[in-house]
């Protein structure tokens, strides 16, 4: 959900001013931590691509070299897209998201994360920056750490693997 509490998975939204500042700050942190980024790959969603561009500017990385990959999109929330989440959470559990009409299920997202992981490890570059989304990011972490995708249904697991906006998570 976005800062307004709306399910925004595949819905195109713009970065807020705060999101822009977070992206710039992430770029500055990365420049100190990993001064050499060989490649930036991001979700093709507008908010993610804009985040990647802001980070790239801070790194001095050419924006025209950012690769968009549809495997990195956020989980699709089906009929919940664009709706406020508070009402859903008052009557449902996280596992119920798999039953929302037209929503991507956790097993489907896990398969996509596996494909994304295979794509990323086959890139012939040392330092690849991936700019993606929270739910999908957790799925990718589970692939790398070999944690079963069913853990996404566990509230504590989601808290333990929560990814904040513009947060740096080093995987490999």
Predicted feature descriptions by range:
Residues 26, 57, 61-63, 67-68, ...:
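Acidic, low-complexity terminal tails and accessory targeting/binding regions
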Residues 14, 55-115:
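Phosphate-handling substructures
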Residues 36-44, 67-68, 127-131:
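Short glycine-rich phosphate-binding loop at a beta-alpha junction
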Residues 1-61:
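Active-site-proximal alpha-helix that buttresses catalytic centers in soluble enzyme cores
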Residues 46, 72-73, 135:
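Catalytic metal-binding/acid-base residues of hydrolase active sites
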Residues 33-36, 120-126:
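Glycine-rich phosphate-binding loop signature in dinucleotide/nucleotide-binding domains
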Residues 115, 120-123, 130-135:
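His/acidic metal-ligating clusters that form di-metal
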Residues 134-138, 167:
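GST superfamily/GST-like fold recognition
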